[in-house]
């Protein structure tokens, strides 16, 4: 009996030493792992939908090829969570079809999602959905920790198939949180439990929670194999270092002695943590009734002084607050000018009013002259680009603030800006006094710069201390998108109907050349259901509507439709074709669209063209007549809008048609831009 007891004591001592060495080694290993692990961006497939991912904000890497139409996207700028994450990224322009990293942020569900065609992806409409998301460039915020492994709402997620997810009862460790080493007293307690031959009753949860020994909160686990309870201890939540204040661990009290099914628990440290991610602060999507891309040109010249510069910044901050900045509404950037202009931040730098106001506060004055014309040229060439966050469906607006008067000319720079579709507003403060007017470089500069001279685009303030009074009228005007006339350009504001001669004299080969000419012209325009629309009619003795203005709303679809037009063959009744186009095409044109008819023929008409052409002119249809080979010059001049020299063209051979594309486009734009600005 004594021998047995000695043997048991020897075994206990041996086990104690093993556990002690193991605990020390574990402590060293734990100390080595305190360093935060390097963030690994999780990869997802093109078909992964945002709604399947539980994380409220995360960075992922998309593969190439997500432009494929089989990956459905719902919405524009703000997407329903039923959408493909990577498909939405391509649609928004954050990614191209080669893939890459993106930042995804969950936002509230919407009452409706509008479909649109953008960057090769056709998004679909959806009446409502419970959750939305926006896609941004993968620039992580300071102090925010993003998950290296995504949490999916289904066990059969793509990550699970790749072996990346954890079991249901496991949780990823909180960055910066480490478990304390097992203490000597705990090891002795376990050792005594092993050595004692009698069976001890299991502690109840209440007994565990009311122990008199002061120690950190603990979570108990039971080993199925050894029928032993081991305790994992953690640092107190008050002393635990945090990488992200937005992520907190739940208080483990009340969770003691949980028994995870199938968990292998070894002696010593058994970590079990519960994560609780605080709901993110609500992110405004912006006012959808004021979806504009706005650039403020602020005066940083030396003459303005520091005090007035601060007043100017205060107006900017107030505008940012009043506009309700967001991806579904207005976006705003700031350019400061002096001798030379410089961008402080572009349209996609700050996508909510709070961040924008903070950034405005940090702007410092540059000094120098007041070269406004140079600044307008800079904005026209550099600011409104896709890389800077410019959106195709949002009007481009520039608000120029001028103290006194510019030190350079603005007329030519402003004309180019208007022709590029930019709506220029001017706020002038404290104009030139009578004895200062001799120094003004360009008299009446504001009217030469603004989009229209009807007073809508100009605001004048007698004193800097009255600048705040411009806030409400300015916000109201820039958000009145129906009156932003300069958003309409020669390339985005027309309904263009091609009337194509398909008579026998043309021939199959030449007919394909004519279609290529139509394609080359179409490529020059901005195509969508709200921009330029294209329709086509083919005629011989009879007429055929190939497609109407409302048939296709994207450039690729239009170009494919032109390719599919089949050669008809027959006689040449040009007059009847004009009447048919007026009835079947232009009768369905939108009231706010310029109506352009481009007629191509290779011979004299069998019927009268004078009365149909006059009807077209009276209905406001601007008609271009292009004759090839045997076309009659006098007929072309009758068909064409006055002056005929700008609207009729004769080409000796079909193969030379392509040479006239630049000239026709130039004439269309010259005529558009010569409209009165009042």
Swiss-Prot record:
Q: Where in the cell is it found?
A: Secreted, Extracellular space, Extracellular matrix
Protein name in UniProt: Vitrin
Gene Ontology terms, cellular component aspect? Answer: extracellular region; interstitial matrix
Give any GO molecular function from the UniProt entry.
Answer: glycosaminoglycan binding
Species lineage, top-down? Eukaryota, Metazoa, Chordata, Craniata, Vertebrata
Q: Where is the VWFA domain?
A: 293-478, 495-668
For the LCCL domain, which residue ranges apply? Answer: 40-133
The main location is secreted
CDD domains given in the database record: vWA_collagen
Report residue spans for region: Disordered. 154-177, 199-257
Compositional bias segments (type: Polar residues): 154-168, 230-240
For bias kind Low complexity, which ranges apply? 199-216
The residues that carry sugar chains are: 390, 520
| Cited InterPro entries | ECM_Assembly_Org, LCCL, LCCL_sf, VWF_A, vWFA_dom_sf
Oligomer status and interactors: Binds dermatan sulfate and chondroitin sulfate.
> What PANTHER family does the database record attribute to this sequence?
COLLAGEN ALPHA, VITRIN
């Amino acid at each position: 009996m004594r021998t047995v007891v000695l043997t048991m004591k020897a075994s206990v001592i041996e086990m104690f030493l093993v556990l002690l060495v193991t605990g020390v080694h574990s402590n060293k290993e734990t100390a080595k792992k305190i360093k935060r692990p390097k963030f690994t961006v999780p990869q997802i497939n093109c078909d992964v939908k945002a709604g399947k991912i539980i994380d409220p904000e995360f960075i992922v890497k998309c593969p190439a090829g997500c432009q494929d139409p089989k990956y459905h996207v719902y919405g524009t700028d703000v997407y329903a969570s039923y959408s493909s994450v990577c498909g939405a990224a391509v649609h928004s322009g954050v990614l191209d079809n080669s893939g890459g990293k993106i930042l995804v942020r969950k936002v509230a569900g919407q009452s409706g999602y509008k479909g649109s065609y953008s960057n090769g992806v056709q998004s679909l409409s959806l009446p409502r959905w419970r959750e939305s998301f926006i896609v941004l460039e993968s620039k992580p915020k300071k102090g925010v920790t993003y998950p290296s492994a995504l949490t999916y709402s289904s066990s059969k997620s793509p990550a699970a198939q790749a072996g990346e997810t954890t079991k249901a009862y496991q949780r990823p460790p909180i960055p910066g949180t480490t478990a304390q080493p097992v203490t000597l007293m705990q090891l002795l307690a376990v050792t005594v439990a092993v050595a004692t031959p009698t069976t001890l009753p299991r502690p109840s949860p209440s007994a565990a929670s009311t122990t008199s020994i002061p120690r950190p909160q603990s979570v108990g686990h039971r080993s199925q194999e050894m029928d032993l309870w081991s305790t994992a201890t953690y640092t107190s939540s008050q002393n635990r270092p945090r990488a992200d204040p937005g992520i907190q661990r739940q208080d483990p009290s009340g969770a003691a002695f949980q028994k995870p099914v199938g968990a292998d628990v070894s002696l010593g440290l058994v970590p079990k943590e519960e994560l609780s991610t605080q709901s993110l602060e609500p992110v405004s999507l912006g006012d959808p009734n004021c979806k504009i891309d706005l650039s403020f040109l602020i005066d940083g010249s030396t003459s303005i002084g520091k005090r007035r510069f601060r007043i100017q910044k205060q107006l900017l901050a107030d505008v940012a607050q009043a506009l309700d900045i967001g991806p579904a509404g207005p976006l705003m950037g700031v350019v400061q000018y002096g001798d030379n202009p410089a961008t402080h931040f572009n349209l996609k730098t700050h996508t909510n009013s709070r961040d924008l106001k903070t950034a405005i506060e940090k702007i410092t004055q540059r000094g120098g002259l007041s070269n406004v014309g140079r600044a307008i040229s800079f904005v026209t060439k550099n600011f409104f680009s896709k890389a800077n966050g410019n959106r195709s469906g949002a009007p481009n607006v520039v608000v120029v603030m001028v103290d006194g008067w510019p030190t350079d000319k603005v007329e030519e720079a402003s004309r180019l800006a208007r022709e590029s579709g930019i709506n220029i507003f001017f706020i002038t403060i404290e104009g030139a006094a009578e004895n200062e007017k001799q120094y003004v470089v360009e008299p009446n500069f504001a009217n030469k710069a603004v989009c229209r001279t009807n007073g809508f685009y100009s605001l004048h303030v007698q004193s800097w201390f009255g600048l705040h009074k411009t806030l409400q009228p300015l916000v109201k005007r820039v958000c009145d998108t129906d009156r932003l006339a300069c958003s309409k350009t020669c390339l985005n504001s027309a309904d263009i109907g091609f009337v194509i001669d398909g008579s026998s004299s043309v021939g199959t080969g030449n007919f394909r050349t004519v279609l290529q000419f139509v394609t080359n012209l179409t490529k020059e325009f901005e195509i969508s259901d709200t921009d330029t629309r294209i329709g086509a009619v083919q005629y011989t003795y009879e007429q055929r509507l190939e497609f109407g203005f409302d048939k296709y709303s994207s450039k690729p679809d239009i170009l494919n439709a032109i390719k599919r037009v089949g050669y008809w063959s027959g006689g040449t009744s040009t007059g009847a074709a004009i009447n048919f186009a007026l009835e079947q095409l232009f009768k369905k044109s939108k009231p706010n669209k310029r109506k352009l008819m481009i007629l191509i023929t290779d011979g004299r008409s069998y019927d009268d063209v004078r009365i149909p052409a006059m009807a077209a002119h009276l209905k406001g249809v601007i008609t271009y007549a292009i004759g090839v080979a045997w076309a009659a010059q006098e007929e072309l001049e009758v068909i064409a809008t006055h002056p005929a020299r700008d609207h009729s063209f004769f080409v000796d051979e079909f193969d030379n048609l392509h040479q006239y594309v630049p000239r026709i486009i130039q004439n269309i734009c010259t005529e558009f831009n010569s409209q009165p600005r009042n």
